[in-house]
């Protein structure tokens, strides 16, 4: 059994990318998969289940009084391709640590024997910054392969570098390795070249470039993966290619994160930092002009 995790900047399309890829792994390649959602939004399994946000382990435990009172079938639901789906959940906004939900859920699943008869366990983890709680799948050596979903946008690359730094921190103590960068395209100029360059500097690979296609949004509106909604579409083939690459991936490395000035040099080299600063400068000038008119 292989334990993988998808990390990435908030809003980058991490949950969408992971569910579409895992759907192809299960449906086309017969892989037995369990998804453990590690995001308080509980949206890591929505497309696989063709349903609204799944009831979380923490929610059921709170209703019953303790996690020891929870039955496995109350929180583990089968979805498309036989994929088992669990959402860890989190506390009320502003109260407690969301990372605690991940720890509670994983311990519960292990004690209940949920990790048997599987080829892959996939953790879908919130993460602009790998804080202690959200790093739990890495820190406790649960997730062995980390895939970072990013794009050619500056903040997505900044987050990818931060996550690589978190992987490095625990790589020597445990067996966690970086499996590669998944570029979820935002149609940035020279995006493929940029992410390949970043991957090389991080001592990893751009495992796949996922082109931007509106069919993904059309499927999402219907709470479906592209594999279910339009299996013959070119986008379904792209997710299948990524699925194959993950199944056959042997390039698992210890990352070499960049210093901030090195990352900025890379962005300058590709003209991205200058363009971003120009946009910010124009916005500030416009704001000042508006204030002067008042």
From Swiss-Prot:
InterPro entries assigned: NifH/chlL_CS, NifH/frxC, Nitrogenase_Fe_NifH, P-loop_NTPase
Modified residues (ADP-ribosylarginine): 100
Cofactor(s) this protein requires: [4Fe-4S] cluster
Enzyme's top EC category: oxidoreductase
Keyword Kinase in annotation: no
GO biological process, one term: nitrogen fixation
Reaction(s) catalysed by this chain's protein: N2 + 8 reduced [2Fe-2S]-[ferredoxin] + 16 ATP + 16 H2O = H2 + 8 oxidized [2Fe-2S]-[ferredoxin] + 2 NH4(+) + 16 ADP + 16 phosphate + 6 H(+)
GO molecular function: 4 iron, 4 sulfur cluster binding; ATP binding; metal ion binding; nitrogenase activity
PROSITE patterns on file: NIFH_FRXC_1 (PS00746), NIFH_FRXC_2 (PS00692), NIFH_FRXC_3 (PS51026)
UniProt: ATP binding residues: 8-15
CDD domains: NifH
Keywords for this protein: 4Fe-4S, ADP-ribosylation, ATP-binding, Iron, Iron-sulfur, Metal-binding, Nitrogen fixation, Nucleotide-binding, Oxidoreductase
EC number: 1.18.6.1
Post-translational modification: The reversible ADP-ribosylation of Arg-100 inactivates the nitrogenase reductase and regulates nitrogenase activity.
Pfam families in the record: Fer4_NifH
Cofactor descriptive note: Binds 1 [4Fe-4S] cluster per dimer.
Protein family: Belongs to the NifH/BchL/ChlL family.
Subunit structure: Homodimer.
PANTHER family, per database record: LIGHT-INDEPENDENT PROTOCHLOROPHYLLIDE REDUCTASE IRON-SULFUR ATP-BINDING PROTEIN
Its job: The key enzymatic reactions in nitrogen fixation are catalyzed by the nitrogenase complex, which has 2 components: the iron protein and the molybdenum-iron protein.
NCBIfam families xrefs: nifH (TIGR01287)
Record-given protein name: Nitrogenase iron protein
Organism: Trichodesmium thiebautii
């Amino acid at each position: 059994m292989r334990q993988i995790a998808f990390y990435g900047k908030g809003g980058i399309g991490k949950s969408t990318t992971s569910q579409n890829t895992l759907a192809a792994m299960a449906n086309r390649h017969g892989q037995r998969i369990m998804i453990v959602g590690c995001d308080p939004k509980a949206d890591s399994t929505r497309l696989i289940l063709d349903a609204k946000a799944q009831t979380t382990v923490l929610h059921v435990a709170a209703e019953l009084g303790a996690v020891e009172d929870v039955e496995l079938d109350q929180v583990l639901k089968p979805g498309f391709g036989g994929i088992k789906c669990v959402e860890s959940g989190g506390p009320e906004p502003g109260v407690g640590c969301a990372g605690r939900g991940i720890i509670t859920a994983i311990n519960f699943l292990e004690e209940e024997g949920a990790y048997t008869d599987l080829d892959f366990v996939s953790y879908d983890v919130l993460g602009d910054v790998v804080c202690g709680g959200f790093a739990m799948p890495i820190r406790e050596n649960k997730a062995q392969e980390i895939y970072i979903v990013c794009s050619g946008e500056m903040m997505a690359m900044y987050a990818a570098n931060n996550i690589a730094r978190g992987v490095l921190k625990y790589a020597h103590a445990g067996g966690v390795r970086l499996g590669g960068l998944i570029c979820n395209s935002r149609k940035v100029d020279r995006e493929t070249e940029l992410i390949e360059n970043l991957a090389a500097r991080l001592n990893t690979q751009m495992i796949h470039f996922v082109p931007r296609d509106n069919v993904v949004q059309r499927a999402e509106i219907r709470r479906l993966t592209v594999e279910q909604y339009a299996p013959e579409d070119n986008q379904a083939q792209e997710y299948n290619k990524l699925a194959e690459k993950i199944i056959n991936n042997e390039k698992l490395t210890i990352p070499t994160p960049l210093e901030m000035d090195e990352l900025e040099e890379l962005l300058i080299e590709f003209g991205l930092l200058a363009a971003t600063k120009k946009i910010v400068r124009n916005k500030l000038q416009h704001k000042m002009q508006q204030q002067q008119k008042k």
